[in-house]
Amino acid sequence: MKDISKYQGIIPAFYACYDEKGEISPEGVEALTRYMIEKGVKGVYVGGSSGECIYHSVSERKLVLEHVMKAAEGKLTVIAHVACNNTADSCELAAHAESL
């Protein structure tokens, strides 16, 4: 049986962070990630529908995940939602998530 202990505890959906222009804020994403770590969150679910993924382009979804991973520094279990309304984009997001 595989160890599933990394999936215990609080694992909320991660909300995207925006700047004054309505663009994804890498700094905001990193700050929210660090805040969640400080508050005892054990993992995050990035890119799901609660995190506005249906409104984001593939490049925006990649950007959010990249900055979550950067700020998490291995301290969080990160679950990357990669589903899209077409297979090619889902495959692209899955390959990107795996590369991080």
Regions found by a protein language model. Give the residues of each.
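Active-site beta->alpha loop and helix N-cap motifs at the rims of alpha/beta catalytic domains
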Residues: 2-12, 17-100
